[in-house]
Amino acid sequence: MVMACRVVNKRRHMGLQQLSSFAETGRTFLGPLKSSKFIIDEECHESVLISSTVRLLESLDLTSAVGQLLNEAVQAQNNTYRTGISTLLFLVGAWSSAVEECLHLGVPISIIVSVMSEGLNFCSEEVVSLHVPVHNIFDCMDSTKTFSQLETFSVSLCPFLQVPSDTDLIEELHGLKDVASQTLTISNLSGRPLKSYELFKPQTKVEADNNTSRTLKNSLLADTCCRQSILIHSRHFNRTDNTEGVSKPDGFQEHVTATHKTYRCNDLVELAVGLSHGDHSSMKLVEEAVQLQYQNACVQQGNCTKPFMFDISRIFTCCLPGLPETSSCVCPGYITVVSVSNNPVIKELQNQPVRIVLIEGDLTENYRHLGFNKSANIKTVLDSMRLQEDSSEELWANHVLQVLIQFKVNLVLVQGNVSERLIEKCINSKRLVIGSVNGSVMQAFAEAAGAVQVAYITQVNEDCVGDGVCVTFWRSSPLDVVDRNNRIAILLKTEGINLVTAVLTNPVTAQMQIKEDRFWTCAYRLYYALKEEKVFLGGGAVEFLCLSCLHILAEQSLKKENHACSGWLHNTSSWLASSLAIYRPTVLKFLANGWQKYLSTLLYNTANYSSEFEASTYIQHHLQNATDSGSPSSYILNEYSKLNSRIFNSDISNKLEQIPRVYDVVTPKIEAWRRALDLVLLVLQTDSEIITGHGHTQINSQELTGFLFL
């Protein structure tokens, strides 16, 4: 499919130009307010609606070497983390342009690779100061209560980015005690604790709301003043005196204040809202799925003696296009769709526990397990004329049915494909066969129902059959949930099964894939936050810290002696050391420009700024303040603590108290940075081998430009 084309200068690094072109197509997917795209096939003129970077790349022509490398990097990030893909693609483009600028200024390739790699490593170390511990999330959770409060939250999209002023923020109906217990506090330089959500109020609206919210503020401050201020998750805040210098490469000093209050998150709803990035409906389903898993773990373990771990491998989705979005929900058990021809079978089985058989491979006549060697020179002789008239598949299907009847099996789950002929016979005998079942579902039913998975139906015996499975319609009126493919949704469950299914519905079929992608993105964000027990202060704070630190390093490098600059890289040649002193500030500034473009685009995509230039000017103002402070991390944390700060709020609704903090996952974000830079540097070094070769000198003038089709 073709989206656009771009002029490519063949005398420049073509691979870097191609990376920039590919990345340009995904700019609108950066940030919480994404703009969808219609991709039109140039051959059949069919269109596809997409709203994510992964789906975008699936629709582009990536047959070139650079396109394949980009696709591999994106797929690796998506298959592992399911988040951070838009960040990866954008930084690939931004840093490709940065490298091109470095080459244009004559910076040696080895210097570019060394300084950019070290610069990113330095940023990865610095952002540790913005970690927020996630502990004891489930300690105070009621195992008998199902949360549905997430839908009432409206999240602040970003410290730099905020909800437009006309956004309707719905009040969270918690008592003062609940609000106080869930509100996180920090202290400013004077030591006065402040509510975390005060950070988002504009100065013009502080005075107007001062009287109406004074009672709530006093109650919260009284509760939080008693909390001890200790930050143990950052090397910047473990000093006993007020300010202390922390050693950095090239003499970079981090002056911080020891009076900062520790940011913590110990509430599941708050964490889920912070990680939703504006997609409240999807995160609400994820949060309910976690709650159901927690309830099941409490029942199985008895008072939850073991720490609860969110198992994302036991979460599944069932997409039902054509139904209203209000039908989306989360249910314990396994929900799937079957043909409406199974309707009489479901009605027959729904009022009784059924016995189950689990088949690992295909349930077809010709299926053989992996590694099977067919015996040679063997012929089958049939001595019955009646059997000869029947097909071999008919004989096989009859045999399978006899096995099911013998062991009184009414439900068969198959991991692979199922013979259509067998399905027909089973329907006639009131037996349900379901194919293409996920392996984790098979394992869950094996554990809960006591069944044993087998490769062939001939291996079934009494010990392999499970029991106690309930089969029913997902809704009491099955005809109300028939999708456009003439299928109905059914629910399979048994006592103690560790399975949760999110039913995703949408009246627009074209948006069904988008809804499922967003659900899994939210699920993996919450999964990694709980797994790592830490998150970032999100919404641009981390990238702003990287931008600020790199600018400070670049400015300090200009003032350093050559030997001091070369001390950052050890065991290098004298040529590299001397070149490093000359070019290092330039490379660091271009690397930082990638973060500047990232934040500017993020701001522009929220529609709070009329142009990226205006957004960039806004960021530049705070960048100067952070640089002048000498401690970017302290500047960011101090701005969080200020009641009237504008670095983390633009024009925002006056309903302040409903706006919680925004978070980012740690490892997926950093890995997206690393993959982006690794890809750019790989293409850079590959291009250098090709362009500096003999063939480059023979390029004709009329071949200097060309078109890159995307």
UniProtKB/Swiss-Prot annotation:
GO cellular component, as recorded: cilium
InterPro entries: BBS12 (IPR042984), Cpn60/GroEL/TCP-1 (IPR002423), GroEL-like_apical_dom_sf (IPR027409), GROEL-like_equatorial_sf (IPR027413), TCP-1-like_intermed_sf (IPR027410)
Annotated phenotype, changing G540V: In BBS12; significantly reduces the interaction with MKKS; shows significantly decreased interaction with BBS7; the interaction with BBS10 is not affected by this mutation
Origin superkingdom: Eukaryota
Keyword Ion transport assigned: no
Ranges annotated as spanning the membrane: none
UniProt record, GO biological process: chaperone-mediated protein complex assembly; eating behavior; fat cell differentiation; intraciliary transport; negative regulation of fat cell differentiation; negative regulation of stem cell differentiation; photoreceptor cell maintenance; stem cell differentiation
Subcellular localization: Cell projection, Cilium
Keyword list, A-Z: Bardet-Biedl syndrome, Cell projection, Ciliopathy, Cilium, Disease variant, Intellectual disability, Obesity
Impact reported for Y524C: In a patient with Bardet-Biedl syndrome homozygous for a mutation in BBS2; uncertain significance
One Pfam family linked to the record: Cpn60_TCP1
GO MF, any single term: ATP binding
Disulfide links within the chain: none
PANTHER family in the cross-refs: BARDET-BIEDL SYNDROME 12 PROTEIN (PTHR46883:SF1)
Record: disease: Bardet-Biedl syndrome 12: A syndrome characterized by usually severe pigmentary retinopathy, early-onset obesity, polydactyly, hypogenitalism, renal malformation and intellectual disability. Secondary features include diabetes mellitus, hypertension and congenital heart disease. Bardet-Biedl syndrome inheritance is autosomal recessive, but three mutated alleles (two at one locus, and a third at a second locus) may be required for clinical manifestation of some forms of the disease.
Assembly, per entry: Component of the chaperonin-containing T-complex (TRiC), a heterooligomeric complex of about 850 to 900 kDa that forms two stacked rings, 12 to 16 nm in diameter. Interacts with MKKS.
Family recorded in the similarity comment: Belongs to the TCP-1 chaperonin family. BBS12 subfamily.
Function: Component of the chaperonin-containing T-complex (TRiC), a molecular chaperone complex that assists the folding of proteins upon ATP hydrolysis. As part of the TRiC complex may play a role in the assembly of BBSome, a complex involved in ciliogenesis regulating transports vesicles to the cilia. Involved in adipogenic differentiation.
More info: Adipocytes derived from BBS-patients' dermal fibroblasts in culture exhibit higher propensity for fat accumulation when compared to controls. This strongly suggests that a peripheral primary dysfunction of adipogenesis participates in the pathogenesis of obesity in BBS.
Protein name: Chaperonin-containing T-complex member BBS12
Source organism of the structure: Homo sapiens
